[in-house]
UniProtKB/Swiss-Prot annotation:
InterPro entries: Aldolase_TIM, RibuloseP-bd_barrel, Trp_synthase_alpha_AS, Trp_synthase_suA. The keyword Coiled coil does not apply. It comes from Solibacter usitatus (strain Ellin6076). It is an enzyme of class 4 (lyase). This is Tryptophan synthase alpha chain. It catalyses: (1S,2R)-1-C-(indol-3-yl)glycerol 3-phosphate + L-serine = D-glyceraldehyde 3-phosphate + L-tryptophan + H2O.
Length: 267
């Protein structure tokens, strides 16, 4: 069992929910990322998604697109993200999920990525644009090296896709709260409740909801329905706005703590 599996087992026993934090690795520079992860963990983040910057990020909204551009400009590659993970592992046991697109993974090589990611301390991988209908070789390569494979289900997902997502996912299933790209929203889509129900019927895995979550109120609303809530653009925006500030890590920790309070006293 990976750190991801152990995390959710522990949280289930303690009747608590997970706050999953996304950040773009290498933004504003690769050297910044380990310290930013430490700040997120101090603030209460239970699992970290390390986003791999990519030149054609079709699922990303403008905030994360800009973060990817900054990270690429700073020389961040898939290989350097794995090096960042190694540095994080020197001081932390927080579960790490590699969040990337299919193209960089195919260029790197499936088996090579599985081996190198496992050696770097990565616990799982999520390919945002992977076709679950054609995922067998990818899943086999990741599982061969002990990595979880997390897949996305959206309000528009067919029953067949949900069935395959349930079959190939390990660790947890990532539910997209709405269609479209990532980004903060004032309100959450009403379509997420039927999606939760549909995926619950297909798997016993923990469910995490992401896309558009940026406030403690969002965390509170969804935390009563699923095992985990994912926050991404709100963290990335804070990093963007305070990249030159000596207090960036303190601000990130404080905001994480504020979001975590959305789960209530048992978070």
């Amino acid at each position: 069992m990976t750190r991801i599996g152990r995390l959710f087992d522990c949280l289930k026993r303690e009747n608590r929910k997970a706050l999953i934090a996304y950040l773009t690795a290498g933004d504003p520079t690769p050297d910044h990322t380990p310290g930013l992860v430490e700040a997120l963990v101090r603030g209460g983040a239970d699992l970290i998604e390390l986003g791999v910057p990519f030149t054609d990020p079709i699922a990303d909204g403008p905030v994360i697109q800009r973060a990817g551009e900054r990270a690429l400009k700073a020389g961040t590659t898939l290989a350097s993200v794995l090096e960042i993970a190694r540095k994080i592992r020197e001081t932390s046991e927080v579960p790490l999920l590699l969040f990337t697109y299919l193209n960089p993974v195919l260029r790197y090589g499936l088996d090579r990525l599985g081996a190198d990611a496992a050696a770097a301390g990565i616990d799982g991988c999520l390919l945002t644009d992977a076709s679950v209908e054609e995922a067998e070789s990818y899943v086999a390569a990741m599982h061969k090296h002990g990595l979880d494979t997390v897949f996305l289900a959206a309000p528009t997902s067919t029953a067949r896709r949900i069935e395959l997502v349930a079959r190939y996912s390990t660790g947890f299933v990532y539910l997209v709260s709405r269609t479209g790209v990532t980004g903060e929203r004032e309100s959450l889509s009403a379509s997420v409740a039927p999606l939760i129900q549909a995926v619950r019927a297909a798997t016993d895995l923990p469910l995490a909801v992401g896309f558009g979550i940026s406030k403690p109120e969002h965390v509170a609303e969804l935390g009563s329905q699923v095992e985990a809530v994912v926050v991404g653009s709100a963290f990335v925006r804070l990093i963007e706005q305070n990249a030159e500030s000596a207090a960036l890590e303190i601000q990130l920790e404080s905001f994480t703590r504020e979001l975590k309070r959305g789960f209530g006293a048992r978070a």
